[in-house]
């Protein structure tokens, strides 16, 4: 996250990657350049790097997922919709799932992967109704979705520890 102006890695990326790693998943946190286009290009290049070095990194690239909060959620969704090739990453498989937190993104494509999304009901930046409408439209297009709104939470709740969102990451990986 960070509105494409800065990278909120300490709140979202690093804690999420660490938690996923504890659950036995390979996880990478990306520090990207500001700006929507350049951030997506950086994500596409990172995916390309992981695919090109999968053996060396000892990772399985089958059915990978993209995770992001706020601006990072948009990046994950756009790569899910348009693929890495649209952002200079070459012809790679699209993610098997997108996990997104607190973003007001409404656009989607009928080729989007299954999507899990969550947001707080007091988010002054990302209106939960926009996320809900997006996921409902995706469901109507035949895309599997799961959506959660957490009571009393604003923008940027991260892992949700000690809040109504605690444990959301377990739902997302289930």
Q: Where does each model-flagged region fall?
A:
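Active-site glycine-rich loops that stabilize anionic/oxyanionic intermediates
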Residues: 1-5, 70, 121
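Catalytic nucleophile-loop/oxyanion-hole region of alpha/beta-hydrolase
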Residues: 8-12, 28-61, 161-165
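Short amphipathic alpha-helix adjacent to the substrate-entry channel of hydrolases
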Residues: 9-28, 135-136
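A fold-wide structural signal in alpha/beta-hydrolase
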Residues: 21-31, 65, 97, 144-146
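Primarily recognizes the serine-hydrolase "nucleophile elbow" in alpha/beta-hydrolase
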Residues: 41-112
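Short alpha-helix in the alpha/beta-hydrolase fold that links the catalytic acid
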Residues: 113, 127-137
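Short beta-strand/loop motif that positions the catalytic acidic residue
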Residues: 117-119, 123
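C-terminal catalytic histidine-bearing segment of alpha/beta-hydrolase fold enzymes
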Residues: 139-174
């Amino acid at each position: 996250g960070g509105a494409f102006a800065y990278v909120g890695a300490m709140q979202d990326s690093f804690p999420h990657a660490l938690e996923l790693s504890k659950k036995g998943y390979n996880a990478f946190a990306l520090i990207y350049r500001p700006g929507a286009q350049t951030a997506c290009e950086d994500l596409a290049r990172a995916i390309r790097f992981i695919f090109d070095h999968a053996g060396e990194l000892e990772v399985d690239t089958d059915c990978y997922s993209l995770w992001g909060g706020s601006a990072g959620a948009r990046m994950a969704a756009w790569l899910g919709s348009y693929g890495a090739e649209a952002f200079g990453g070459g012809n790679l498989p699209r993610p098997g799932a997108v996990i997104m937190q607190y973003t007001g993104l409404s656009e989607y494509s009928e080729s989007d992967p299954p999507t899990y999304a969550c947001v707080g009901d007091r988010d002054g930046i990302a209106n939960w109704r926009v996320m809900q409408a997006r996921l409902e439209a995706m469901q109507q297009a035949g895309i599997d979705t799961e959506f959660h709104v957490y009571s009393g939470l604003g923008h940027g709740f991260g892992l949700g520890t000690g809040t109504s969102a605690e444990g959301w990451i377990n739902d997302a990986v289930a």
